[in-house]
Amino acid sequence: MAAADVEYRCFVGGLAWATSNESLENAFASYGEILDSKVITDRETGRSRGFGFVTFSSENSMLDAIENMNGKELDGRNITVNQAQSRGGGGGGGGYGGGRGGGGYGGGRRDGGYGGGGGYGGRREGGGGGYGGGGGYGGRREGGGGGYGGGGGGWRD
């Protein structure tokens, strides 16, 4: 990634279904200039998927927002705020408690994103599963699973 392509983007999880792009932006506006705010919605239903992204113009603004907003309440729900993972491939194996076959927080598969592959601490015995398993947060959904505890697969020898 070239220096000009650097994005200072936060992942915001645990959003209320009612949270809009505007209310997400308003909640983070005091931390610096916001270039973009987006609540991710289901393509078919148009309903919020419970997470979104906020992109800042500077790294300091992003870091302040992460430090001050993580665990805070927005629209009646406690939110999780982290630095967003790159859109590129996952981190390859391991990660946050990742067991067999990749897994972990953004590890394993090229469709990457949060929990791509085995999911958030998932063991990956037959696919899917875990916190965002399969497509995962920010993943391209090149296969089953996806979402909170996304399904798919079973025990496999």
Swiss-Prot record:
Skewed-composition ranges (Gly residues): 87-157
Biological classification of the source: Eukaryota, Viridiplantae, Streptophyta, Embryophyta, Tracheophyta
Protein name (Swiss-Prot/TrEMBL): Glycine-rich RNA-binding, abscisic acid-inducible protein
Gene3D superfamilies: 3.30.70.330
UniProt domain RRM: residue ranges: 8-86
GO molecular function, one term: mRNA binding
Gene that produces this protein: RAB15
Keywords attached to this entry: RNA-binding, Stress response
Record InterPro entries: Nucleotide-bd_a/b_plait_sf (IPR012677), RBD_domain_sf (IPR035979), RRM2_NsCP33-like (IPR048289), RRM_dom (IPR000504), SLIRP/GR-RBP-like (IPR052462)
Gene induction: By the plant hormone abscisic acid in response to water stress.
SMART domains assigned: RRM (SM00360)
CDD domains from the UniProt entry: RRM2_NsCP33_like
Function: Possibly has a role in RNA transcription or processing during stress.
